[in-house]
Swiss-Prot record:
<keyword id="KW-0436">Ligase</keyword>
<keyword id="KW-0067">ATP-binding</keyword>
<dbReference type="InterPro" id="IPR027417">
    <property type="entry name" value="P-loop_NTPase"/>
</dbReference>
<feature type="binding site">
    <location>
        <begin position="73"/>
        <end position="80"/>
    </location>
    <ligand>
        <name>ATP</name>
    </ligand>
</feature>
<dbReference type="GO" id="GO:0005524">
    <property type="term" value="F:ATP binding"/>
</dbReference>
<dbReference type="InterPro" id="IPR000559">
    <property type="entry name" value="Formate_THF_ligase"/>
</dbReference>
<comment type="similarity">
    <text>Belongs to the formate--tetrahydrofolate ligase family.</text>
</comment>
<keyword id="KW-0554">One-carbon metabolism</keyword>
<protein>
    <recommendedName>
        <fullName>Formate--tetrahydrofolate ligase</fullName>
        <ecNumber>6.3.4.3</ecNumber>
    </recommendedName>
</protein>
<keyword id="KW-0547">Nucleotide-binding</keyword>
<dbReference type="Pfam" id="PF01268">
    <property type="entry name" value="FTHFS"/>
</dbReference>
<comment type="pathway">
    <text>One-carbon metabolism; tetrahydrofolate interconversion.</text>
</comment>
<dbReference type="GO" id="GO:0004329">
    <property type="term" value="F:formate-tetrahydrofolate ligase activity"/>
</dbReference>
<dbReference type="GO" id="GO:0035999">
    <property type="term" value="P:tetrahydrofolate interconversion"/>
</dbReference>
């Protein structure tokens, strides 16, 4: 039975649902897991993925369902809520269903956006643990990452203080000769802290470190988080960590975590991080939570490991891609599925009347400010014009050979006439379409949606990648820009073109993934341009190299790995009851 999502806050719904939440022992029985495959951690548990996958290696995989979205408003269009709602709807239909979602960062949770647990009757529980650190994965990543910085800055200090003979005699280390102006790594913290974007470290005497400019980034922007999302096992994780480039020496050669002899210790911090955490929906469908990388510089997905486990345990496995189909889905399609070898059956395109109205020329949507009446009152013209963005995204999904299902994530202000326009446009573009009221009604409100996905899963598809790995970097970027974003072409800055040419000539980078860096608020590089922009070219100003994750990131704009905290952050409304320890105010 659904809770009253209009009157109850998300944290209140979670608290009520938690009263009947299965224990780790009950989950082991429900999922058919053996005792040594569950690693209990309080009310939650991690699972030993290697043992499960090895035991079930001969079991056929379930149906693989990805959830993406049209280009969103700054408010987001409810992909996580839709993912959870689909699990609940499939559960209501009696299906063996589960999923895998990303772990949220403490930064957005305490800032304007809030947590990523879903919402209303379609959320993950227990919400407090989910929102406030879960089973410690992000903390482990922070310790591992910052240990790398400690190793590098200490090494720079010792190399400054000792000559080559002293360095060898006292420490047994060779001189790395790191260039302080070419340090790639920074420190990380799991908050939005704009005051830490640019800092100076090492002030004091010769034993107080190496004086230089440095920086902090948000924890989920760490290359370690990206590695966690794509690693296949602990050996792969350790190898990738040792290959991370932390800086360049004064001759221009990369300096890695392996060179600093710190990579293995960093991997030791993440020995448990590699195992997914088991949670559930408010209606008690199981869901793994694992990894949480940015979708702008990284893959923007939960982990390959969680998907591999879920596909063995569930007949229907639901996962979510960050941002919209042009970014998150494109990386799911051409990176995650290529790395994993898994082939999806269905992609759900989350659509809202609100976002379609914005793309149709509606007033500007600003996070933290009241919506214009155009978004809460019927306006068929705006919806019809805005459907162009949805139709474009359907085309992107179909280009991958995956069966698309449009989910109208229906709000109470949406009208039947508005939804009818969306359905007509979606079906004309070759997609199934279903309305869903999962936020309000949980699984019961997602039955039409679940049925559409079940039907789509039974249809054959012709999944294939957009480009072969043999294709050169600049050709890949041009193909993504023209066939996914709708650009007329690509303009490379001279420095970026030179770097791309160097990377294309070095066979070491041939199998690196192409990880585009672009705004999520537009199909173009300009967040102001809505709908489906015409007559534009994609500018590439730089190419970032993530040698551990094996990503090459062409940048179509500036990025900051440290968001800022807004003027009305969520932490102002979060509290804890001293008598019970229960947390209130999360959303």
């Amino acid at each position: 039975m659904a809770y009253n999502a209009v009157e109850m806050a998300d944290w209140q719904i979670s608290e009520a649902a938690e009263e009947n939440m299965p224990t780790p022992e009950q989950w082991a029985e429900k999922l058919g897991l053996q005792s040594d495959e569950m690693l209990p951690m309080g009310r939650l548990a991690k699972v030993d993925f290697l043992k499960i996958i090895d035991r079930l290696k001969d079991r056929p995989d379930g149906k693989y369902i990805e959830v993406t979205a049209i280009t969103p408003t700054p408010l987001g269009e409810g992909k996580s809520t839709t993912s959870v709602g689909l699990m609940e709807g499939l559960g209501m239909r009696g299906k063996n269903v589960g999923g895998a979602l990303r772990q949220p960062s403490g930064g957005p949770t305490m800032n304007v956006k809030g947590t990523a647990a879903g919402g209303g009757n379609s959320l993950l529980i227990p919400m407090t643990e989910f929102s406030l650190g879960l089973t410690g994965d992000i903390n482990d990543i922070m310790n591992a990452h910052n240990l790398g910085m400690v190793a590098m800055t200490a090494r720079m200090q010792h190399e400054r203080n000792y000559n080559d003979e002293q360095l060898q005699r006292l420490t047994g280390m060779r001189r790395l000769d790191i260039d302080p102006t070419r340090v790639e790594f920074g420190w990380i913290i799991d908050f939005c802290a704009q005051a830490l974007r640019n800092i100076v470290i090492g002030l004091g005497g010769r034993f107080d470190g190496y004086t230089m400019q440095s920086k902090f980034g948000i924890a989920v922007g760490s290359e370690l988080m990206a590695i966690l999302a794509v690693a296949t096992d602990l050996a792969d994780l350790k190898e990738r960590i040792n290959n991370i480039t932390v800086a360049f020496d004064k001759s221009g050669k990369p300096v890695t975590c392996g060179d600093l002899e710190v990579g293995n210790a960093m991997a030791a911090f993440m020995r448990n991080t590699i195992n997914p955490t088991l949670m559930c929906t408010a209606e008690y469908q199981p869901c793994f939570v694992h990894a949480g990388p940015f979708a702008n510089i990284a893959v923007g997905q939960s982990s390959i490991i969680a998907d591999r486990v879920g596909l063995k345990l569930f007949d229907y496995h639901v996962t979510e891609s960050g941002f919209a189909a042009d970014i998150g889905f494109e990386k799911f399609w051409n990176v995650k599925c290529r790395f994993s070898g898994l082939k999806p059956h269905v992609s759900v395109l989350t659509s809202t009347i609100r976002a379609l109205k914005m793309h149709g020329g509606g007033p500007k949507v600003v996070a933290g400010k009241a919506l214009d009446d155009a978004y809460t009152k019927e306006n068929l013209e705006l919806v019809e014009k805005g459907c162009e963005n949805m139709v474009h995204m359907i085309g992107v999904i179909r280009k991958a050979g995956i069966n698309p299902v449009v989910c109208i994530n229906r709000f109470y202000t949406d009208t039947d006439a508005e939804c009818a326009i969306v359905r007509k446009a979606a079906e004309a573009a070759g997609a199934r379409c279903a309305e869903s009221k999962h936020w309000e009604k949980g699984g019961e409100g997602a039955l039409e949606f679940a049925d559409a996905v079940i039907e789509a899963c039974e249809e054959g598809n012709d999944f294939d990648f957009l480009y072969p790995l043999e294709m050169k970097l600049r050709d890949r970027v041009n193909k993504i820009a023209t066939e996914v974003y709708g650009a007329d072409g690509v303009d490379w800055a001279p420095e970026a073109a030179a770097k791309a040419e160097m990377l294309e000539s070095d066979p070491k980078y041939a199998d690196f993934a192409t990880m585009m860096v672009k705004t999520h608020l537009s199909l173009s590089h300009d967040p102001v341009k809505k709908g489906v922009p015409k007559g534009w070219r994609l500018p590439i100003r730089d190419v970032l190299i993530y040698s551990g994750a094996k990503f090459l990131c062409p940048c179509a704009g500036t990025i900051s790995l440290m968001p800022g905290t807004g003027s009305n952050p969520a932490f102002r409304r979060i509290d804890v009851d001293p008598a019970t320890g229960k947390v209130s105010g999360l959303f």
